[in-house]
UniProtKB/Swiss-Prot annotation:
Gene3D superfamilies xrefs: YVTN repeat-like/Quinoprotein amine dehydrogenase (2.130.10.10)
Tissue-specific expression: Expressed in all tissues examined.
Gene that this polypeptide is encoded by: PPP2R2A
Protein name per the record: Serine/threonine-protein phosphatase 2A 55 kDa regulatory subunit B alpha isoform
Organism: Homo sapiens (Human)
GO molecular function, one term: protein-containing complex binding
Lineage: Eukaryota, Metazoa, Chordata, Craniata, Vertebrata
Length: 447
């Protein structure tokens, strides 16, 4: 499987697993988002309990190639608390829907995190010195009586144990009527967008009390509503361009230079439906759960229920590549509809060189597709392979007929074990995969 480096086949091996082993998982511990920062040295996860946990790549071990995939807890903080909307009598969950890192400009790191309604800008900074020797203040912070000061001292900085502080710098609230599903930082690093089911807003990172509505698909009569916005993202290089996907399987590319309200798209990406595949579930499974631009900005990837599609921005009428993630589930759509799994929102990600794409599946399986060799592989995130440097064995699912020894039957897949969130290190072959409440880190095997 090709990775950040290019076309050679890669053996993936286990590096770490984070989180408790319990079968009885608390709802608050379920991981809801995973994101590497721009250098890959930090990895953030958000959970349903409103917490953000940041892991840092082991600095000493970066030189030792077999330990590159070791991450240790750097900072943990409560990003969002549960709230109650008294006007609508609605509870607002604390669950973190998305995390996005800003590029590092100084010693501190900044990230955006959002729940259903409120976006917060967090500053993550280190402190390893503290001031000492104030004239009018005791070491515990109490003020002295100025009349007791007989000599003047020059305050000095003394070394202390490293402290990592997370402080909220901005809170962007009261701009979304519906649940926020996406945030995306613009390539100008000054603005970002936030999208809910029917609207997309544009924000400036310094201004919290005002945002511009750039897309509004809400009909005058809500009975005429036929689709909702499912994801949105800014282009990585062109600061005026963004895309948003819909529950009908379409992707619209908009140019903010054309008009203030981008209700008219510049391009519409849509694949004509094959009439022979039409069924009751067609519209549900064509809903796009994630859209991601390639690092180069030439392509974008979309994930629907059964497949991953790669689109060339210059070709709207069909994708240039389609990869079947779990086609063997097509015959199971009826039972997946009954247990609500058909509404699961799987995400997808690119590797650093845009040559491989990755997405999750059921039974704690995740899939990789090599765009150059057209090879694909299914791997499993499991504690059975949890010795460091254990090479992951490819898994195969048997759809029908006789099952070979190393295959797993489609009927024995566990639909409660699912990988919705994955992330790929921007520069190395290190991947982070979230199962229910565990974070697995895998890396390529280096001889």
């Amino acid at each position: 499987m090709a990775g950040a480096g290019g076309g050679n086949d890669i053996q993936w091996c286990f590096s770490q697993v984070k989180g408790a082993v319990d079968d009885d998982v608390a709802e608050a511990d379920i991981i809801s988002t995973v994101e590497f920062n721009h250098s890959g040295e930090l990895l953030a996860t958000g959970d349903k309990g409103g917490r953000v946990v940041i892991f840092q790549q082991e600095q000493e071990n970066k030189i030792q190639s077999h330990s590159r995939g070791e991450y240790n807890v750097y900072s943990t903080f409560q990003s969002h608390e549960p709230e109650f909307d008294y006007l609508k009598s609605l509870e607002i969950e604390e669950k973190i829907n998305k995390i996005r890192w800003l590029p590092q400009k100084n010693a501190a790191q900044f990230l955006l995190s959002t729940n259903d309604k409120t976006i917060k800008l967090w500053k993550i900074s280190e402190r390893d010195k503290r001031p000492e020797g104030y004239n009018l203040k005791e070491e515990d912070g109490r003020y002295r009586d100025p009349t007791t000061v007989t000599t003047l001292r020059v305050p000095v900085f003394r070394p202390m144990d490293l402290m990592v502080e997370a402080s909220p710098r901005r809170i962007f609230a009261n701009a979304h009527t519906y649940h926020i599903n996406s945030i995306s930082i613009n390539s100008d690093y000054e603005t970002y967008l936030s999208a809910d089911d029917l609207r997309i807003n544009l924000w400036h990172l310094e201004i919290t009390d005002r945002s511009f509505n750039i897309v509004d698909i809400k009909p005058a009569n809500m009975e005429e509503l036929t689709e909702v916005i499912t994801a949105a993202e800014f282009h990585p290089n062109s600061c005026n361009t963004f895309v948003y996907s819909s529950s009908k399987g379409t992707i619209r590319l908009c140019d903010m230079r054309a008009s203030a309200l981008c209700d008219r798209h510049s391009k519409l990406f849509e694949e004509p439906e094959d009439p022979s595949n039409r069924s009751f579930f067609s519209e549900i499974i064509s809903s796009i759960s994630d859209v991601k631009f390639s690092h180069s900005g030439r392509y974008m990837m979309t994930r629907d229920y059964l497949s991953v599609k790669i689109w060339d921005l210059n070709m709207e009428n069909r994708p240039v590549e389609t990869y079947q993630v779990h086609e063997y589930l097509r015959s199971k759509l009826c039972s997946l509809y009954e247990n609500d799994c058909i509404f699961d929102k799987f995400e997808c990600c690119w590797n650093g060189s845009d040559s491989v794409v990755m997405t999750g599946s059921y039974n704690n399986f995740f899939r990789m597709f090599d765009r150059n060799t057209k090879r694909d592989i299914t791997l499993e995130a499991s504690r059975e392979n949890n010795k460091p440097r254990t090479v992951l064995k490819p898994r195969k699912v048997c759809a029908s007929g006789k099952r070979k020894k190393d295959e797993i039957s489609v009927d024995s897949l566990d639909f409660n074990k699912k990988i919705l969130h994955t992330a790929w290190h921007p520069k190395e072959n290190i991947i982070a995969v979230a199962t229910t409440n565990n974070l697995y880190i895998f890396q390529d095997k280096v001889n």
